[in-house]
Design a protein with these regions (language model features):
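Short aromatic-glycine-(Arg/Gly/Cys) micro-motifs in beta-strand/loop hairpins
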Residues: 1-9
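Short beta-strand
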Residues: 4-5, 42-44
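Short, well-ordered beta-strand elements within core beta-sheets of diverse protein domains
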Residues: 10-17
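Solvent-exposed alpha-helix faces
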Residues: 27-28, 70
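A short N-terminal helical cap/helix-turn-helix that marks the beginning
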Residues: 33-43, 70-77
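C-terminal structural segments of small proteins and small subunits
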Residues: 51-77
Length: 77
């Protein structure tokens, strides 16, 4: 599944075998976000995690968003 671009945001939903697998993934993303100093919006559901990226201070998508999206995708491979 690819990232979906809507307005000034890209988002993607990841599915997991268990709720805790999703939580582990969110923790990995949190560490990555701190390293990159770029923080996504995260929605946690049952066996699903939705990540949304935008550069708030720019009011638009920037290279930071696409870079973090790639790094997040790399966590799942």
């Amino acid at each position: 599944m690819q990232w979906n671009e809507i307005d000034k945001t890209i988002s993607k939903t990841f599915e997991f075998n268990s709720y805790l697998d999703g939580i582990d993934f969110v923790n990995e993303i949190a560490n990555l976000a701190e390293q990159e100093n770029h923080h996504p919006d995260i929605k946690i559901g049952y066996c699903k995690v939705t990540i949304s990226l935008t550069t708030h201070d720019a009011g638009a998508l920037t290279e930071k968003d696409y870079k973090l999206a790639k790094l997040i995708d790399d966590l799942k491979t």
